Amino acid sequence: MENKITTMEGGMQCRTELLLGKDNLEKIQSARVLIFGVGGVGSWCAEGLVRSGVRNITIVDSDRVCVTNCNRQLMATSRTIGEVKVDALRQRLLEINPDANIIACQKIYQAETAEEFHMEEYDFIIDAIDSLKDKADLILRATALPKHITFVSSMGAALRRDPFMIRKTEFWKVDGDPLARCLRKRFKKNKTFPRRKFICVYSEEKPMQNMGDQRLVEHEWCSTKAQINGSLCHITASFGMAIAGIVINHIID
């Protein structure tokens, strides 16, 4: 019987190589990617990258899988509830490609922990965190790194339902996204600005209002947010795959 493991790399990427060529596939395989936040957006981004041939990914998140994650987060299933998110996702990614180098960090990104991640060692840094304060700090630090390190940020994916309104643009050109607006306001208030331009994935759709009762999630042990917004898998997954696409296209362009 054919050894599935030893033939994995050649077999699973034959369609990628057929489309992009051997040289581009090798570039993809050698890229180093750091993903902050592996929830509804980041988990799908990681999967898209691994399936496209990226071998070296570090995933960062401090949370455990909660039952309410099961509607949108890749690794969240009835079996993984209670597990550390990055561990569950790492296992999933290694099932896709056992030869991948997936580093799982159960840590929270904050100004106090930023130096622990050695961002200068990566080719791509993906921001998929939703804390305004921490996101702002990450943006400032990532855009201060050398220009060969590409930074991509996800804006708000909650409270939307139309995947055909998802776009990409430079941060200062994002229109209609409350998260981007709050970030820009924060930068202006503090008089600290990103050192360079960077691409964001966002939605032009006007955010909806939660139609359900907030008490549905008031006892959600896996979240410390004062306000929890509804979200849908086809939106968060589209955000994540769009970011994966930006990374892949940047590698081969």
Locate the predicted segments by residue:
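Glycine-rich phosphate-binding loop and adjoining beta1-alpha1-beta2 segment
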Residues: 54, 59-97
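N-terminal charged helix/coil linker that caps or initiates catalytic domains
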Residues: 1-34
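Conserved N-terminal Rossmann-fold NAD(P)-binding element of oxidoreductases
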Residues: 35-37, 60
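Hydrophobic/small residue at the entry helix of a nucleotide-binding pocket
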Residues: 41
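Glycine-rich phosphate/adenylate-binding loop
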Residues: 2-6, 120-124, 129-135, 151, ...
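Conserved SAM/SAH-binding loop
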Residues: 106-114
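Conserved S-adenosyl-L-methionine
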Residues: 50-56, 147-148
